[in-house]
Amino acid sequence: MRKLFEKVFGTYSEREIKKLDKTVDQIEALEAAYSKLTDAELKDKTRQFKERLAKGETLDDILPEAFATIREGAWRTLGMKHYRVQLYGGMVLHQGRIAEMRTGEGKTLMATLPVYLNALSGKGVHVVTVNDYLAKRDQEWMSKVYNFLGLTVGVIVHGITNEDRRKAYHCDITYGTNNEFGFDYLRDNMVIHLHEMVQRPLNYAIVDEVDSILIDEARTPLIISGQGDKSTKMYFIVDQFVKTLKKEVDFEVDEKANSVTLTEEGVERAEKYFAVDNLSDMENTELAHHINQALKANNLMKLDKDYVVKDGEIIIVDDFTGRLMFGRRYSEGLHQAIEAKEGLEVQRESKTLATITFQNYFRMYDKLSGMTGTAKTEEDEFISIYNMDVVEIPTNKPVVRIDEPDSVYKSEKGKVLSIIKDIEEKHKKGQPVLVGTISIEKSEELAAALKKKGIPHEVLNAKQHEREAEIIAQAGRKGIVTIATNMAGRGTDILLGGNPEFLAKREMKRMGYGDEIISMVTSHAETDNEELISARGKYEELYKRFKAETDREHEEVKAVGGLHIIGTERHESRRIDNQLRGRAGRQGDPGSSRFYISLEDDLMRLFGGERMLGIVDKMGLAEDEAIEHRLLTNSIENAQKKVEGRNFGIRKHVLQYDDVMNKQREVIYGERKKVLEGENMRDHIFSLMANIVDESIPMYTSEATSTPEIDTEGLRNHLSKIFLKADFGFINGQNKDVESLKSQIVAAAEKAYAVKEEEIGSERMREIERVILLQVIDTKWMDHIDAMDQLRQGIGLRAIGQVDPVRAYQLEGYDMFQEMINSIQEDTVRFLFSIEKEAVVERKQVAKPIEASHGDGDAKKAPVVKKEESGRNDLCPCGSGKKYKKCCGK
């Protein structure tokens, strides 16, 4: 029925695109007039648009003219003009939706349309990319057109100073990675002076590779952490124990659930080994956690698939892109357990200081949009979590790539033999081949098999990270064979015949030019540096020479069928498979793709492989004989849908928990900002004092009789510990009216505070209030994050007792939050009343971040973490007023 409807009325995307026809016609109609404008007249359009917006016009009102302006500006500065399909895509992005655009169709240029339009509001636009290289490349490339039209452009990359960050965020347009934007938000909410904040309010973000950032990364929260104080010896002891255990006897592995658990026999062995009576007792929680993480490290985490060992460190491999994730660590002790497994030095565990998921960070923007080559399969998730639908943008030229049916084999061995045969055939006729594998291990096995056959090839995986650009630049040349681990997010088009820009730069390096000069030869920035001017001249000369060569080779490669894609197994996500396929057939070029599948592949083995194997066995096929059957194709797709559904469930689960923390985080960060912005916190302190009194009286009041009985001695003693030196002598057995008593207590507390303020001085007292409020809020919040994390880890057991774990987490989390708020109020007031006239009080961070990472979020991906530690001579963060070394740091 749906297919019939779409045949008559068009697909959802086709209908949505049709609605934009009229506006796109308007934009194209302006081309003739705008092309006649002088540079000065075109540049002045920006000023005119800003004036019109200030007078009440909306961005939608000026959209056709603004798009026509940036279109003409791009032509004059970059020599590129937006195609009609890019105008559609730009409008979809402006509307806060996801534009699905095929590889090589010009997403980077398309984004300039909504970026320019929205930057005119003066509130800032963030363009989010997956890595620093792409952020710098796109900023440098597109800044020429923005600068030409009078807009400022900044870039946020790892390692730049706070001052540079602030400048970049105050530009009209800011490029950067999802990690950097998220960490800056967290860091801004840890500063102790308002001027240290770098970000402006979050206005509009365009997320490139939106599926990678908002779907794949969604299970891994951003974490800023400080140094923990636990010993690392336990990791080695537990690792030695776990290595003595036998699979299926002492522990069981559930690959589908990605979990490993001790059997009853295993529990008994653990209790005997560690001399404990009951591993499930509360006092043994930490030991049980160590054992679980060591079991995971030794049985689920695979060397050269999930991580590599480099320079004595464990470096995580991104599941989806195959890139090395330098600086990231698994959380909850898993990273340390892997270090112990590999016999490396174990780093100390960390304490979480601030955390947020990408889901909740990006939902804070007033408007959010995204672009990618593959998003339609995840549209339900984009709608339910981000309220963004997906619109497929038509290609500029028809796609002529041939997607051949899957070839399914009984065994891994038979599959590999057929892959080698296919590569050999294509290589002989000069057709370039890109082979996609799902792990480093598989790519190296295939490379070894090709070497035996004498077929020259390049390998691109996390271990060859540094040579990535070089390998990709050559992947479309005649007869080249490239093996790549997960091509997602590589950010570089594969050009048939080769990339003349890269070839020219490589030749310049061979001629002795330095890396810095070479990196600047394609920059559009004006310069009076004679060496650079000369280098640019040489580059132009070489580029023309190589362009003639690659153009000739481009035609030769087209004649033999273009780039051929081979998938060595299906990924658990259809989207990743589509990304690999999308590498061929860009801009109307020919190309082909085929996936090779074995019933021994993880996906088939875990989801329906046994049934398939039974059917295939009955057919009596040879190992290297391919099977093609609708039942098999359906089985593969169903397996992928199952995994996608499970992963969506995990991400939704993570979000349900983080939504609880998110509401609490908003309250705390809001309070911090009030303190940073507030000139005078005296009224706020008085309201805290009144709250404490409101909370305290019911604690000492009995409702057993018709007239409330107040334990006056208990109440007086309690209040005297908080409001030091306040005179509460009037609290005696005569107090019958609770409301009257409240007023008297508050008045006495305010009077004592006024005496304290007179003694210290009003101006100094205002700063002391801010210092103590910040210190208490930060200390309590960081402890609360840990407590909530522990609650979450233990809450799963409630499901056994027919209690919804998420609901239990919400209720108990709320109670814990209220307790923290009460504790903040009491500690703040007590510290203020106990401050001495000669006390030295200055703003200091409770903890200083030393690591940024991703948390593991129920997945095998790493947290994004940053770390902090109190100095020996700093005031102790517990609020005692003593130096750290004399108090908690003993």
Swiss-Prot record:
GO terms for molecular function: ATP binding; metal ion binding; protein-exporting ATPase activity. The keyword Cell membrane applies. GO terms for cellular component: cell envelope Sec protein transport complex; cytosol; plasma membrane. Signal peptide: none annotated. It comes from Alkaliphilus oremlandii (strain OhILAs). It catalyses: ATP + H2O + cellular proteinSide 1 = ADP + phosphate + cellular proteinSide 2. PANTHER family: CHLOROPLAST PROTEIN-TRANSPORTING ATPASE, SECA INNER MEMBRANE COMPONENT OF SEC PROTEIN SECRETION SYSTEM. It comes from the Bacteria. Its cofactor is Zn(2+). The gene is secA. Residues 851-872 have a biased composition (Basic and acidic residues). PROSITE patterns: SECA, SECA_MOTOR_DEAD. May bind 1 zinc ion per subunit. ATP binds at Q86, G104, E105, G106, K107, T108, D493. This is Protein translocase subunit SecA. Belongs to the SecA family. The keyword Metal-binding applies. It is found in: Cell membrane; Cytoplasm. Its EC number is 7.4.2.8. It is a peripheral membrane protein. GO terms for biological process: intracellular protein transmembrane transport; protein import; protein targeting; protein transport by the Sec complex. Monomer and homodimer. Part of the essential Sec protein translocation apparatus which comprises SecA, SecYEG and auxiliary proteins SecDF. Other proteins may also be involved. Transmembrane segments: none annotated. It holds the Pfam family SecA_DEAD. Keywords: ATP-binding, Cell membrane, Cytoplasm, Membrane, Metal-binding, Nucleotide-binding, Protein transport, Translocase, Translocation, Transport, Zinc.
